[in-house]
Amino acid sequence: SSRMTDARYAAGAWRRGSRTPSPPWEIVHALSTIMTRDRKILIKDWYEGLYELGEEEINLLNEKNERVDLSALKKEFGIEKFVLDREGVEAIKARTYEPTANIQGMVSGYTGPGHKTIVPNEARVRIDFRLLPHMNPQKCIEKVKKHLIDHGFGHLEVIAFDAAEPPYKISVKEDISQAIIKAAEEVFGEKPVVNGVSAEGTILKHVWMPTVLTGFANPGANLHAPDENIHVENYIKGIKYAAAIMENFSKE
């Protein structure tokens, strides 16, 4: 999260619009140095030591591409195309193996009804970066701060939240992975589609234990959204799925 505060209060643009710094414009200019329109992150050494895909990962991406209906996914999202017109394996790969720089929200000034010509005295933006294995969250935070300083934005206040989670990855060959695959086939009649998350990384950096986060929600469940939902059928199958995972894992 970054913030810039300039004056003690917002003032009319006619009084100081051409003479004083504009916090929202400073934020906009700073953001433009972070990522290009083709999604390349410009922070120095951001891709240093980036995880390289092996034969196992490439084969799994191809298999996943054959099973995921990207057209249905676009319809669910309400979009006509993915970023950079990606399709097929490239779209699947981007979801799992590409670092991101996402703007969650921006706040500044007045956007209400009527006329008001002010220069806001403060602007805030909240950004999240999704990392891949071998990328250290703390080092990445320092890279962001240094990037802003090097580009003339050292006056921006950068607040890094403590909830940064280290990325991690396990092989599909692990016992727990195989148990989940078998359980999904038994309960749902097909292999699971597992997308990358790193919630467990906070624990696993202290005590390593192969872990997989898997779900059973229905398409359109809108996880984490105000209208998050689950069908009763999926809820019941989820109970059976959890039991099948434990049973299969005990046999591995």
Name every feature range the model reports, one short phrase each.
Residues 6-8, 16-17, 129-137:
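A generic structural motif
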Residues 44-122, 130-143, 151, 155-252:
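An extended, acidic, His-containing surface patch that forms the Zn2+-binding/catalytic region
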Residues 1-4, 12, 16-74:
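Polar, glycine-rich mid-to-C-terminal structural blocks
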Residues 1-8, 215-220:
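Short, small-residue-rich loop/turn micro-motifs
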Residues 28-33, 124-125, 242:
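Active-site-proximal alpha-helical segments within enzyme catalytic domains
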Residues 34, 38, 145-154:
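A common structural junction motif
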